[in-house]
Amino acid sequence: MEVLGFAGVPTVLFLEPPDEAALARFADCRAVGIAGIARSQTPAWMDANLPGIFDTLARIGAPVTHYKVCSTFDSAPQVGSIGRAIELGVPRLGGAWHPLLVAAPALGRYQAFGNLFAVAGGAVHRLDRHPTMSRHPVTPMDEADLRRHLARQIAAPMGLVDLVALQGGRADAALAACLDAGERIVSLDAIDEATIAEAGRLIWEHRGERLFAIGSQGVEYALVAHWRRIGLLAPEAEPASAPPVKRIAVVSASCAPVTAAQIAQARRDGFTTFAVDAAAAADPALWARELDRAERDGLAALREGRSVVLHTAEGPDDPAIIRTRAAIAAAGEPAETIHARIGAGLGRLLGRLAAQSGLTRGVIAGGDTSGHAAQALGIGALTALAPLAPGAPLCRLHGSARAGGLAEIVLKGGQMGGPDFFQTVLRGGHAATGEIRRQDA
């Protein structure tokens, strides 16, 4: 959404499959998305829910349909299976081949010879050695070769168009060789603006009547770069900004070191921070009481004019994570059910704080959390309002049934944004160019 929207392509992101009336309200939009929670769900959930979503997208009839995955490819056979999503999407969305483009140099995500790398702490790490992703609490990544990783989730031949082909003018021939070998899923390398644009050219020129692509927002970065080169889009314009606000509320279930650093910086910047005991979510009654307590604490600070952060953890080494895992293990419920309860509870908490304090801007931190929390807020659709950091724009809410008066929101993956990100949200400012070029993970 943000990549296309800020490039001049009117874009809307729905939180549920839109009907004809909803589409008509955004008739000016040239790009339409449907946000979901598949990344935190089982293959059985996908079987029950993704076909209807894919059928809706097929009826829209876009030349390229993109199944958006995390730029660090978070997935496993039992949860967030990208392979299962591909199996369900291909017969409905078609295409002679299916580009797999996860690299996004603007986010500090690079792919070389099929292996994904990501920035953390100012250095570039291979994915299986990444300080955050190798220790992800739900989908730890132990394989950097994306074709090898994906092969655990889907039995399908996979090809590669590598840097040598992309940089040497042989990308078309490399793609043809993959297709001749029966490799319909084709991974694309990219390390810089030139290779991401060449990947975009390959996708656009070989889209056929329609194309089902898989990848991060690198797919949109690639297409935008190519469209600018051929004159379909104007050159990059000065990014928009939003007016500052006096207070914001942040709810976070992220365990990422990046979010932990943001919480610590927010505290130094005068935000009041509160721990929320996620272990209580193993018992719905205890969780309701814990959310009530967090609401009282957060509301008191907001009424005193302070911004607040309510968080379930500060980094991957927070003892709260061990307590939460133990509570989940003892609960007798599927872990994904309790994780969904945590995300939905934090969403309701944000809505209640907004309703009682007059807040108009909020933040939800945590990739898995954001989907559940946004659904709990009853958000109908989002449009991009202002860039704050790559992958974490300020968005305008549309049709937010339970958002308590919130008009603007940021849905922030745990690894997105610089240390002062929450202060940036408060100001409504946008990231500096250097931040955009090397987004820390």
For each predicted feature, which ranges?
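N-terminal basic/disordered segments at the start of proteins
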Residues: 1-27, 48-49, 103-106
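Conserved, well-ordered active-site substructure
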Residues: 359-417, 421
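Cap/lid and interdomain-hinge subdomains that line or gate substrate/regulatory clefts
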Residues: 30, 42-47, 52-69, 73-196, ...
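Short acidic, glycine/serine/threonine-rich loops at helix termini
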Residues: 2, 25, 77-81, 109-118, ...
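A structural-propensity feature for long, helix-poor, extended segments
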Residues: 27-38, 306, 395-435
